[in-house]
Design a protein with these regions (language model features):
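Phosphate- and divalent-cation-binding pockets in alpha/beta enzyme and binding domains
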Residues: 18, 64-65, 126, 233, ...
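A structural signal for short hydrophobic beta-strand segments in well-ordered beta-sheet cores
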Residues: 26, 161-164, 247
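Structural beta-sheet core signal
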Residues: 8-10, 55, 116, 142-143, ...
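N-terminal glycine-rich phosphate-binding loop and ensuing alpha1 helix
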Residues: 2-68, 91
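Conserved beta-loop-beta/alpha segment of the NTase-like Rossmann-fold superfamily
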Residues: 79-161
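Conserved alpha/beta core of the MobA/IspD/sugar-nucleotide pyrophosphorylase nucleotidyltransferase superfamily
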Residues: 2-4, 173-277
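Acidic donor-binding segment of Leloir-type glycosyltransferases
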Residues: 60-84
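Conserved core of the sugar-phosphate nucleotidyltransferase
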Residues: 124-204
């Protein structure tokens, strides 16, 4: 069944503290100074049918981000439905609650199957082509990249390790924090699949997650550092048989921006003759 009518849900509510506070999705990484967001949209165009672009933002970055989203949408005539919501930060916290909160906060705006994406990541046109050709719109998928394709140099990163049964149904996600490439063997780098927050989900998942999130917040109401990590909440829904997900393996190349130094390496990846945009 070929995927049709997908909403894009971009997470962009973070503070970008390791990036000087500027929205990473506005980094100019394309051969003609295109932003990361425009390059991301370019990877999806003609591979999936986009009916809505929704962005989770914060109060500080809202205007800059939405200006770029609208500009790119108008330039490429992508869709008529551009929406956003602000991920609120309680007074007792300096940062948002986390990725699960960002995703859940969009629940009032998402009414069709959607692709969840990090706004500062690029997932490769090949990945979206396979999603468009092979994914069943009625199911939930986590798109897995090999561990090695998502780790570079000696920079630390967080990755959700994916465990599946013999039918490729996801049975557990294990979030590992501050890992480096050197921690793992070549076999693990080539064969362990991880999530970098690219998922195809049904809108009902958002309501289920919101219920879990409310409980989490009530338990950590005085903890300014507690973080609602998306893999943990997906795990909880799977254990309760509320959510069933399949692993969709991609051989696409992931690129992401966390630090200022990453901008140049991502730009070089797109300028490489081997790179398909």
């Amino acid at each position: 069944m070929k995927v049709r009518d997908l909403t894009l849900l971009f997470i962009a509510g973070g503070k970008s503290s390791r990036f000087g506070g500027e929205p990473k999705m506005l980094s100019k990484i394309g051969p003609n100074e295109e932003t990361l967001f425009e390059m991301s949209i370019g990877q999806m165009m003609n591979r999936i049918h986009i009916v809505q672009i929704h962005v989770v933002v914060n109060k500080e970055n809202k205007d800059k981000i939405m200006e770029e989203v609208k500009r790119v949408n108008q330039k490429h005539e992508i869709c008529k439905n551009i929406t956003f919501n602000i991920q609120e930060i309680p007074e007792f916290r300096s940062k948002p609650w986390g990725t699960a909160d960002a995703v859940s906060s969009a629940k009032e705006h998402i009414h069709t199957p959607f692709l969840l994406l990090n706004s500062d990541d690029l997932y490769d046109s090949k990945t979206f082509q396979f999603i468009g050709e092979q994914c069943d719109l009625s199911k939930n998928y986590i798109i897995g990249f090999t561990l090695g394709s998502t780790l570079s140099g000696n920079q630390k990163a967080n990755r959700a390790f994916i465990s599946v049964d013999k039918e490729e149904k996801v049975i557990e996600l294990q979030e590992k924090l501050n890992i480096e490439r050197d921690y793992y063997s070549n076999h693990q780098l080539e064969n362990q699949y991880v999530s970098v927050n690219l998922l195809l989900l049904q809108p009902s998942v958002l309501s289920s997650m919101d219920h879990e999130l409310n409980e989490f917040k009530s338990q950590h109401i005085e903890d300014a550092t507690a973080e609602a990590l998306l893999p943990n909440f997906l795990n909880s829904l799977m254990k309760q048989d509320i959510l069933s997900m399949e692993l969709f393996k991609t051989s696409g190349q992931w690129n992401g921006v966390t630090y200022k130094d990453d901008v140049q390496s991502v730009r070089e990846a797109f300028l490489s003759p081997r790179k398909e945009n």
